């Protein structure tokens, strides 16, 4: 059974043997206390994903016009996926989900095209657009995911 939180998922899987520890409860309380901001961030990302993507790619085209011209549809697809997975990861407060579900695969694909540097720039620009378009508290929740994308691409 999947829940909205990885800690709870893990504990439910082992419910016959373990109660939640004080530390687990503190983490769940922190999760619950921040949930309204997480939902707000998820909704904003969902509702503005296309605009965030387009604005980010326009900025990228200023630095890498040939790449964007040749790979526009692929760039849109990849960036849309990153936004979608980041929004769900923010909602779940689950960086591991983001890394396992998307980043390892994406880094390998981008590396095969030999455009990791350019794509890392794209995700830096994406975060700058998010910083402009979302309230600061929401943009701050997205930042670890854009940083993870940048690091995964540069280290691929």
Regions from the language model: what does each represent?
Residues 1-104, 108-120, 124, 132-156:
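Core of compact, soluble alpha-helical bundle domains
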Residues 129:
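Helix-loop "lid/cap" segments that line or gate small-molecule binding pockets
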């Amino acid at each position: 059974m999947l829940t909205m939180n990885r800690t709870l998922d893990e504990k439910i899987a082992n419910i016959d043997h373990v109660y939640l520890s004080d530390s687990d409860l503190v983490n769940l309380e922190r999760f619950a206390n921040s949930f309204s901001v997480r939902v707000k961030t998820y909704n904003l990302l969902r509702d503005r994903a296309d605009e965030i993507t387009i604005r980010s790619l326009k900025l990228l085209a200023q630095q890498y016009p040939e790449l964007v011209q040749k790979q526009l549809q692929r760039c849109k697809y990849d960036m849309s996926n990153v936004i979608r997975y980041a929004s769900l990861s923010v909602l779940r407060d689950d960086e591991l989900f983001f890394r396992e579900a998307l980043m390892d695969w994406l880094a390998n694909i981008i590396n095969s095209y030999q455009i990791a540097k350019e794509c890392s720039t794209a995700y830096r620009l994406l975060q700058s657009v998010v910083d402009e378009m979302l309230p600061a508290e929401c943009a701050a929740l997205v930042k670890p995911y854009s940083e993870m994308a940048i690091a995964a691409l540069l280290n691929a």
